[in-house]
Regions:
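Conserved glycine-rich FAD pyrophosphate-binding loop
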Residues: 1-150
């Protein structure tokens, strides 16, 4: 028997978690390098490493579950800073984030910046055509209604 996300209470208190899952090429040397850099950031921010790798035919996803106590303000601050450092590290290597917490959707969407954010501009045009009043999930995945700055 398992209890989904029961490990979120790892630190005690009201447990929380934030996922971080960059996608990289399926190469062992890159996976080892990713592990070393990510593990070092966990250590730097005083967090317990809780991650794995999921392999596909043409990709490798480094699935991280950042566990914390929601009532510990010091810990929540470290988690935020660590998450931002993880995103910056992955961006610097050209790795995109698989999915992200709603709090970080704008941050992650900003990393997809090829051709002056061509993907964001396309998504915004599609959103404007399908949802001109911006009522369906405004801001989801960093896609905001027309007239609202990204």
């Amino acid at each position: 028997m398992s209890f989904p996300l029961a490990n979120a209470n790892w630190h005690g208190g009201r447990g929380g978690h934030v996922g971080f899952s960059p996608v990289l090429p399926p190469r062992g040397d890159l996976a080892l390098d990713q592990f070393k850099r990510t593990f070092a950031l966990y250590r730097q921010y005083g967090m317990d490493y809780h991650a794995s790798f999921a392999m596909g035919e043409r990709h490798l996803t480094n699935v991280n579950q950042i566990l914390y106590d929601k009532d510990d303000t010091d810990m929540t601050g470290r988690v935020d800073a660590m998450f931002r450092a993880l995103v910056a590290d992955s961006r610097a290597r050209g790795y995109g984030e698989y999915r992200t917490h709603i709090e970080y959707m704008d941050l992650v969407a900003g990393t997809y910046d090829f051709n002056d954010h061509a993907l964001r501009r396309l998504n915004q045009k599609v959103k404007a055509a399908l949802d001109p009043n911006g009522v369906v999930a405004p801001g989801k995945s960093g896609i905001w209604p027309k007239g609202r700055p990204a």
